[in-house]
UniProtKB/Swiss-Prot annotation:
It is found in: Cytoplasm. Probably involved in some intermediate steps for the synthesis of the antibiotic polyketide bacillaene which is involved in secondary metabolism. It comes from Bacillus velezensis (strain DSM 23117 / BGSC 10A6 / LMG 26770 / FZB42) (Bacillus amyloliquefaciens subsp. plantarum). Gene3D superfamilies: Ribonuclease Z/Hydroxyacylglutathione hydrolase-like. SMART domains: Lactamase_B. One of its GO terms (molecular function) is metal ion binding. The lineage of its organism: Bacteria, Bacillati, Bacillota, Bacilli, Bacillales. SUPFAM superfamilies: Metallo-hydrolase/oxidoreductase. The gene is baeB. InterPro entries: MBL_Glyoxalase_II, Metallo-B-lactamas, RibonucZ/Hydroxyglut_hydro. This is Probable polyketide biosynthesis zinc-dependent hydrolase BaeB.
């Protein structure tokens, strides 16, 4: 599908954590969106300056601190709108300036971009993926190599199963997937690669999925690269 924007990956660090944030920039419109900005604000503001774009909107996939901690600082600089699912906002009582609640399946315009929201609970109660043309931003719902853990308040492996089944059924194989973390694979792999290589996309029975996702003594859950 034709589009005029570019996707820029920004890897940020804080102690043991590494995250992938994304800037979606349309230089012809001098506009950009950030997805899950975190940890190192200079990396993000420097990239926006380099691209000569204004940060019109911030998309948050869920409310965990390592995905939202730069939302308000960036909003104060650029006066951006901030988007999150209404389910996530309500369950965790998330609050910040210029916060706009989204419903499932909503198509909306932000900064000149057309975006579709896809509610994908599992890792959190109201996780949300964002689809722009042929690019899907998944936060901690789907990684290239796996899916998000389901052990915190509001998490549900059953919900995660249904979210992944929904993604499998609705996202075309050519769409590129941009998660919030990596275990070694570069973000931006095509959906067809995940369908072939991500074990969570291959488990068809909910009971088997839940047992596998919640199995004991898992290692390397936070060994992000």
């Amino acid at each position: 599908m034709d589009h005029t924007y570019e996707v820029h990956q920004i890897k940020t660090y804080h102690q043991m954590w590494s995250n992938y944030c994304y800037i979606i920039a349309d230089r012809s419109k001098k506009s950009a969106i950030a997805v899950d900005p975190s940890w190192e604000i200079d990396k993000i503001t420097d990239k926006l300056h380099e691209l000569d774009v204004d940060l019109s909107a911030i998309l948050l996939t869920h409310s965990h601190y390592d995905h939202v901690n730069l939302a308000e600082p960036l909003q104060q600089i650029y006066h951006s709108d901030i988007y999150m699912s209404s389910a996530e906002i309500d369950f965790y009582q998330f609050r910040c300036r210029n916060l706009i609640a989204l419903e499932d399946g909503q198509t909306f315009a932000a900064g000149g971009f057309i975006i579709r929201s896809i509610l994908t609970p599992g890792h959190t109660a109201g996780g949300m993926c964002y689809l722009l043309s042929d690019h899907l931003f998944t936060g901690d719902t789907v990684f290239t190599e796996g899916c998000g853990i389901c052990g915190d308040r509001g998490s549900s492996a059953e919900d995660m199963f249904h979210s992944i089944q929904r993604i499998k059924a609705s996202i075309p194989p050519h769409v590129r997937v941009y998660p919030g973390h990596s275990f070694g694979e570069k973000p931006g792999q095509k959906m067809e690669s995940l369908l072939k290589n991500n074990i969570y996309f291959q488990i068809e029975k909910k009971e088997h999925f839940v047992n596998f996702r919640n199995r004991k003594n898992q290692k390397g859950l936070f060994h992000f690269k």
